[in-house]
Amino acid sequence: VSILAFKKEKEIYAATYAWFTQVGEEVVVGLLGEQSITTHNLKVGDYCGISVCSKEQKDVALYIGDTHSNEVDKLLGLPYFVDSTGAITLKGSKVTMIAKVVDIIHLQGIEADSLVYFKVVEYHDNEKLDYLLMNDIR
């Protein structure tokens, strides 16, 4: 379970996503749902933070996933870091990445969703923490 977050034009966007995977040494791909305000505001060339949740972040992942960025400040009260590009990463995550959007593709059969290719420019792994899995939140 991962959280994608970024600041753009003074607005903060964050969403919980179930599927991100590494497909190259510095390339991550994510399938982002059509219903997400965050997905609609993500453009090629944007930088964003990808926080791979730790087991301790179950409630955070559920809260961010159950709300919309245009309705509430999803990160209010949460410890996070914003870098100079506007990428936001959550403190306490298993893995944090700063990534640049390289391409956004709409695949046949799931055109509404966005398959997003990211180039990872910064990567940190907290080896003391365990990954939050989908089975942990069902």
Locate each region found by the language model.
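Basic, polyanion-binding surface patches
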Residues: V1-R138
